Amino acid sequence: MPQSTPSQEVQRVPWDNKPALKQITLRATIAGIAIGSLVLTSNFQFGLQTGWVSMMSLPSALLACAFFKNIWPLIFPNDRPFSDVENVYVQSMAVAVGTGPLAFGFVGVIPAIEKFLTNDESGGLREQGQSFTFRELLIWSTALAFFGIFFAVPLRKQVIVREKLPFPSGSATATLISVLNGTEILQEVSKSELLEMRQRRLNECPEVLQPNRDPEEADYLMNSSHSELGDYTATSQDGSSILSTGSENYRANIIILLKTFVVSSLYTMVSYFVPVIRSIPVFGKYLSNNYLWNFQPSPAYIGQGIIMGLPTVSYMLIGCFLGWGVLAPLARYKRWVPPDADVHDWEEGVQGWILWSSLSIMVADSVVAFIVVTVKSIVKFILIDDKAALLNNIIDDTFQSMLLEEERAINSSRRNTYVDGRQDTVRLVSRDNEIEVDSKHLVRYTTVISGCLVSSIICIVSIIYLFGIQVIPLYAIITALILALFLSILGIRALGETDLNPVSGIGKISQLIFAFIIPRDRPGSVLMNVVSGGIAEASAQQAGDLMQDLKTGHLLGASPRAQFCAQLIGACWSIILSSFMYLCYNKVYSIPSEQFRIPTAVVWIDCARLVTGKGLPDKALECSMILGVIFAVLSLIRNTYRDYGYGWILYIPSGVAVGVGIFNSPSFTIARFIGGWASHFWLKNHRGDLNAKTKMIVFSSGLVLGEGIFSVINMLFICLNVPHY
């Protein structure tokens, strides 16, 4: 009897036993920190330029798998195989490290306080332009690093195990990891979805319904049909296995990632020596000089547009035309701004004037969406029919037998598909049942409660140390933490249902609420407002990221406790690296500048000034109110009818996306729109190809990572005074 290879032993582990596999390892921890550091470097570049930060969970998982499949065996040939749950651990840690710039406020709150806050607005605590020291940045990051993680853990049972929110990115990452490692993935289906799967399979192969058909032939026909989850089988005429489709997809994705990374890196290097390519005046010099209508052929911005998708970038383009094609020329023509003011001037120029309209639209959209989601949740809770729930939870023998039949058909269709000796399989379970790992692999509630208390105390002590209890009183910090808890729930649910974590909107809601709590005439009210919003944003960002990763782990059978540890370790490393990178950018570059406009920071400080009673520029209030009302109504319609599946909902623009299109310069939006169109045509021409979207995300991730990581080389060139044109 032949002996099993190590990789085959991993394949044999059923889903229920996978949490017991060793996941917290030194090699996985080092890999997670390394990959996360690359993502963090990329996110800093684009966060300071446009305010855009990405989790990069899918490319992180792909890079981890590539390293441990191709490089690690050359160094340690006798080491145990890399498992899918260990891959989840690496990816979770990489996300925790990489999203530090946004979670810790280094692309918004910190530059807002440093660059724009006046001495009066800070309560006499800081001078405008006074930079934070490295020690202060470490303390600030530590204050925000942990409570969002502890807030999220108790919600896992509700949103993932019970409600089974889809978390599209987390589910896509789980599917990729399953295919790359050739292991079992959990597929939760409802009765209607199961019937659709069965009907589609039978329609594609009606011969299986013929009563006189030979059983073996019918079985072959069933296995050769395409399942709901895709067909990965490739066989020759004699039935022998030829090249594994899983391995082909893996190699193809790696090649795509490397090629796009190289192209984007080359653009970054060339843009240093020929900076004119960053801003090409394709619409003429007048529009370029007065309204910033340029084209920047940045591969990274095109990649961001691919990730965002056509609807979002279309809404941004609407905002771009509204802000820079209508409002800005109107304000200058009507002399609501000085005609000779610099277009880059956030105080006197058109850029500063249209920002108020952008802010009004985003706040109106966020507040209305928050109200609608809250009301829907309350109504849903009140109207639960216990009898109906009881009946739906009764085990239906027919349903269970159908589950087993479809599971067998799907996995049989993959019987010749191997990745390094392993086979990727599917385990179908009823969505009505709660599938959970053993309690010993869950985070203990004593850990959660003590962690919430300790992290909250760390936050309180750190904020008081940095700003003083006279400027930011104790009750304000405690209120911000309590508010952060509730807003984290909103962020998690929004991310789970729409794949979008509205952290910017959550921060604005927090600022708006604090405007009613803190007296406007209190010294330091603007600083207090910004800090409280930063606390809420950090909590929502971390809680959403962790829940997305927990969804990935749940589908693959990873240990929630191991992922929790990965998030904590990643946050600890991100504290140090984020603080260091911000210090480097601050010393090497002039911020704000045309290259690093820090638009998110401007939005933070202007929102704080708005809600604390500062006067607006001429006619900005009237314009902001009109647009705010319009987009509040649109937000009400979109969020009320979003769950009904109406096609026309897609044509109602998102206020947040429109607002982003207004405050970002046109060059950023145009490049992203090109990326959005590219993704639309790609998916349209590859309908039915389940690997098409994965390849598209890998393609775009390579573009983003290449330019982001090689921006460090450009930073080094500046430090060395390397000449350029």
From Swiss-Prot:
It is found in: Membrane. One of its GO terms (cellular component) is membrane. Belongs to the oligopeptide OPT transporter family. GO terms for molecular function: oligopeptide transmembrane transporter activity. The keyword Disulfide bond does not apply. Keywords: Membrane, Peptide transport, Protein transport, Transmembrane, Transmembrane helix, Transport. Coiled coil: none annotated. It is a multi-pass membrane protein. This is Putative oligopeptide transporter YGL114W. Pfam families: OPT. It comes from the Eukaryota. The chain crosses the membrane at residues 28-48, 134-154, 254-274, 353-373, 449-469, 472-492, 564-584, 644-664, 697-717. The keyword Ribonucleoprotein does not apply. GO terms for biological process: oligopeptide transport; protein transport.
